[in-house]
Each structure stands twice: as structure tokens, then as C-alpha cells.
Design a protein with these regions (language model features):
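Carbohydrate-active enzyme catalytic cores, enriched for enzymes
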Residues: 1-38, 90-92, 228-229
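CBM-like, beta-strand-rich accessory domains located in the C-terminal region of large
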Residues: 49-250
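Glycine-rich, phosphate-binding/catalytic loops in enzymes
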Residues: 28, 47-49
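Catalytic-core segments of enzymes that bind and process phosphorylated/nucleotide-bearing substrates
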Residues: 32, 45, 69
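Glycine-rich nucleotide phosphate-binding loop and flanking beta-alpha elements
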Residues: 18, 46, 74
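Catalytic Cys-His active-site segments of thiol-dependent hydrolases/isopeptidases
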Residues: 39-44
Length: 250
């Protein structure tokens, strides 16, 4: 920060104005705490559109986004929404950001995007709302509220920064680096957390990778928190003061 201390950083992607250089990362986040990365995305990969690695780094699941039925978000020009941010406010030190996207199609995640045609896509009527609540050095909360015309499966993906690893428990997920515990992930649902941990997966699809230089992929931990239904809410807290913060639920 300006005083030379370890910085806090949160970015929220709330725009889609052009197909150019666009990944399937609507309402995705990047997160640093105490000057060190916590959440990142898979990065950039060489412009070899048919290559599996390139398809992966552009995908929804390669970002800290909500994946729907294993599909990617549409990047067709007809689906450009401009600015999806409903509000971004600060009350005291606490930041509130909310975005909403109305989706009419989902795109297969295994086809190079320059070869995707309209008939490959999944028609849908989905209203997707994401609320982020951030109190620096204390906690980060992500709440996804999804309404669909039919039952669907939803996965909140969190891709960890290099050097950060996860340990899954029944009620929480511990994130740590080589020196210390960084934070604890807790579900805001009343039922046990329904999460999977992936690192360097190749089959049935790439997951748990990032590219440090645009030419290779390296392994990293990737966490998927799942729910299903027509109307689902997934609430997740990154608790940075895990020894002090009381447990809460939606």
C-alpha cells in the first residue's frame, strides 16, 4: 500500500463490451491478502485455438466463476451485456459489489471458441446474481443466487494462487502456504460443505492448472463447491481471521 505495508486487493469483472480478448469469466474475481495471492485464474496461453490448453484457460471453470452444467458462458456478440454491476458501495471499511447477468445460452466447454456455432449451444433462461462482501484483512464472502427454468448443476470454482494449497474437511477448507495457514473457507449453507479438490487433472477434462508464461501449464489447487436445483444459492466465506470470526449461515 502507500505506506509500504502488505496490500489487500480484490478485483471483480463486471464488464462485457467486446468479444476481443474476452474469456468466459463474467463476474469472476481476483484476490490478494497480506500482499500475497489467494485466488487467481489460469492466465494466458498461446493463440493455438485448437489446443486443449488454450480452450481450458478461456473457460469459465479456469476462472473464479460459477459454472453451470459444465458449460462456459457465451461470448457471442449477441450476448454482450456491457456493464453487469448493479452497485459497488463502501460502508466504513466494508465493500459491497453486486452484479446480475441474464443468460439465454450456454456454450460447450470442449470446442475451440472460433469453431462454436449456435447449434452447439444450450438454450437457457437463467438469471445469475453474484454478491461480493469484502472486509479487508477480515473476510471475503461470495454469494451466487441462480434462478433457472429447469434443474441444473452449479459449481462455484475457486482457483488458488501458486504456492497456496487446500485441505478439505467436512465443515471447512483450510488454505495454507509453506509457512502458515492463510485463511479458512466456510460454507454459508446450513448443510455440510459439498466441495471437491482438483490438482493437475487431465481427464475427463483439464482442471487445476495455471500458465506462468503462456507456453506451459503448471499444477495448482482448484476447489469446486456444488449445488443443484432450479433456484439455488451458494454462499462461501474466505475467513482471514478464522480464530476470531463467529460462524454465520444464510
Amino acid at each position: 500500500d502507500k505506506e509500504g505495508g502488505s496490500g489487500e486487493y480484490l478485483a471483480f469483472n463486471g464488464s462485457f463490451f467486446s468479444r476481443q480478448h474476452k474469456h468466459s469469466d463474467d463476474m469472476g474475481i481476483q484476490f490478494f491478502s497480506d500482499g500475497k495471492g489467494v485466488l487467481t485464474d489460469a492466465g494466458f496461453f498461446a493463440y493455438l485455438y485448437d489446443q486443449e490448453e488454450r480452450i481450458f484457460v478461456e473457460s469459465t471453470r479456469a476462472h473464479n466463476c460459477l459454472e453451470i452444467d459444465g458449460f462456459d458462458y457465451s461470448r457471442f456478440n449477441i450476448d454482450i451485456f456491457g456493464n453487469c454491476i448493479d452497485f459497488a458501495e463502501k460502508i466504513g471499511d466494508c465493500v459491497f459489489i453486486q452484479g446480475t447477468v441474464n443468460r439465454s445460452r450456454l456454450v460447450p466447454a470442449n470446442i475451440p471458441y472460433n469453431k462454436v456455432k449456435d447449434w452447439h449451444c444450450e438454450p437457457c433462461q437463467i438469471k445469475q446474481k453474484r454478491l461480493v462482501i469484502y472486509l479487508p484483512s477480515k473476510f471475503l464472502i461470495i454469494i451466487d443466487d441462480i434462478k433457472s427454468m429447469k434443474n441444473r448443476n452449479y459449481t462455484q470454482w475457486f482457483n488458488l494462487s501458486p504456492g497456496v494449497s487446500a485441505v478439505l474437511g467436512k465443515e471447512e477448507i483450510v488454505l495454507r502456504d509453506s509457512n502458515e495457514v492463510r485463511c479458512v473457507i466456510r460454507s454459508l449453507q446450513k448443510d455440510p460443505i459439498n466441495a471437491s479438490l482438483v490438482n493437475g487433472q487431465e481427464e475427463p477434462r483439464l482442471q487445476g492448472w495455471f500458465s506462468p508464461n503462456g507456453n506451459i501449464l503448471e499444477k495448482t489447487d482448484s476447489i469446486g463447491i456444488e449445488r443443484a436445483g432450479k433456484h439455488s444459492i451458494i454462499g462461501t466465506m474466505f475467513d482471514l481471521e478464522f480464530e476470531k470470526t463467529p460462524k454465520i449461515a444464510l
